[in-house]
């Protein structure tokens, strides 16, 4: 890493990962965007999924590529002597992957679990290590994202002609550690304030699967149980004949290709 180091400040991006070439291209663009936005900072990308790391290395769907987990990168960052460290999650909502980043990788680094760093260096990092939250960490983030999505030219054109559905990932039951699933409902609510043709579904959050979105389009009152919270949404019957699907994920990887784009699945119906 010392050969790559240009600054004493570093941003470590953490994504779940992927095994799709288009996703790798997007990750490269994300890294470039961060470098452009935060000049004077070094920027690196890590994958938190061992499966994605191993499959990328084996060349599944693409030429072999080397990616490393956050522990590998944080160790290298510490050994390189960086003085300001930002670990930025690329997740959409807080869930299992974000919890692992914050409560495992970063915590182990700050506790010098493996004894890789001197006490002097660790003391120098006091208040100099920051963990960036996911895209929709707070409800206000969902509101801001709704406005941003609605301002996208292709989305604005599509929703003016018919249904627009965003497909997120969601936390499966038992893994919604921070109540992050509620953000999808809040996002949908804010989007529908802008245009009732908007819908939000997921691949893993109960009551927001593809078949649930179809029922929402048919209209009715729906109660969502999210942890200890109840959330109610009212939908009018939508008779639109056109529809457009968009992935609500940091990259278009396996879910976008095999869940959303599969003609045999409801998300593509």
Predicted segments with their positions:
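Active-site-proximal alpha-helix that buttresses catalytic centers in soluble enzyme cores
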Residues: 1-269
């Amino acid at each position: 890493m010392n050969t790559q180091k240009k600054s004493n400040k570093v941003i470590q991006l953490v994504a779940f990962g992927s095994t799709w070439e288009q996703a790798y291209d997007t990750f490269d663009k994300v890294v470039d965007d961060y470098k452009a936005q935060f000049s004077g900072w070094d920027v690196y990308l890590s994958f938190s999924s061992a499966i994605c790391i191993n499959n990328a290395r084996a060349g599944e769907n693409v030429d072999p590529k080397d990616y490393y987990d956050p522990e590998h990168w944080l160790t290298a960052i510490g050994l390189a002597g960086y003085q300001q460290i930002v670990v930025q999650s690329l997740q959409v909502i807080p869930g299992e992957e974000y919890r692992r980043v914050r409560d495992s990788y970063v915590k182990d680094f700050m506790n010098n679990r493996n004894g890789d760093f001197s006490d002097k260096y660790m003391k120098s990092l006091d208040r100099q290590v920051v963990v960036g939250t996911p895209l929709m960490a707070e409800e206000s983030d969902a509101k801001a994202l709704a406005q941003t999505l609605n301002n996208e030219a292709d989305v604005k054109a599509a929703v003016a002609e018919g249904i627009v559905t965003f497909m997120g990932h969601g936390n499966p039951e038992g893994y919604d550690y921070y109540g992050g699933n509620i953000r999808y409902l809040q996002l949908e609510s804010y989007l529908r304030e802008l245009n009732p043709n908007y819908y939000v579904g997921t691949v893993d959050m109960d009551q927001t699967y593809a078949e649930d979105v179809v029922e929402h389009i048919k209209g009715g009152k729906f109660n969502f149980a999210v942890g200890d919270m109840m959330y109610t949404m009212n939908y009018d019957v939508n008779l639109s004949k056109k529809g457009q699907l968009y992935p609500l994920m940091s990259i278009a990887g396996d879910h976008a290709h095999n869940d959303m784009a599969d003609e045999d699945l409801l998300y593509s119906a």
